[in-house]
From Swiss-Prot:
Protein name: Class I hydrophobin 3
General function of this protein: Aerial growth, conidiation, and dispersal of filamentous fungi in the environment rely upon a capability of their secreting small amphipathic proteins called hydrophobins (HPBs) with low sequence identity. Class I can self-assemble into an outermost layer of rodlet bundles on aerial cell surfaces, conferring cellular hydrophobicity that supports fungal growth, development and dispersal; whereas Class II form highly ordered films at water-air interfaces through intermolecular interactions but contribute nothing to the rodlet structure.
InterPro entries referenced in this protein's UniProt entry, alphabetically: Hydrophobin, Hydrophobin_CS
Signal peptide stretch: 1-17
Pfam families (alphabetical): Hydrophobin
Phenotype of gene-disrupted mutants: Alters the cell surface structure and mycelial hydrophobicity. Exhibits relatively slower aerial mycelia formation on a liquid medium and leads to slower growth under stress conditions involving SDS and H(2)O(2). Leads to a marked delay in lignin degradation on beech wood sawdust medium, while the production of lignin-modifying enzymes is not reduced.
Glycosylated residue positions: 37
Length: 108
């Protein structure tokens, strides 16, 4: 029984410790850092009603799609980002839906 508990705990620790794909360069324009409340993979996004809101070819979308984003600058001194912090320097579309953003690790 102890062995099984140890194995389950080790596997759970490994799952929690697995890193997300983060930016490899440390540069991100501060105006490009956003706090996004919603993220979904591109395939799920393509099937959603939100996909009709963007003026690009849906077939070109890959990776993660972020929405309900607000600038981090607007959060300083107020509430913190309790969702996903992303850098949108190379975003294909920047507005209601953000495509091409990269998750970043920021302690706010």
């Amino acid at each position: 029984m102890f062995f099984q508990t140890t194995i389950v705990a080790a596997l759970a620790s490994l799952a929690v410790a697995t890193p997300l794909a983060l930016r490899t360069d440390s540069r991100c324009n501060t105006e490009s850092v956003k706090c996004c409340n919603k993220s979904e993979d591109a395939e799920t996004f393509k099937k959603s009603a939100s996909a009709a809101l963007i003026p690009i070819k849906i077939g070109d979308i890959t990776g993660e799609v972020y929405s309900e984003c607000s600038p981090i600058v607007g959060l300083i001194g107020g509430s913190s980002c309790s969702a996903q912090t992303v850098c949108c320097d190379n975003a294909k579309f920047n507005g209601l839906v953000n495509i091409g953003c990269t998750p970043i690790n920021v302690a706010l």
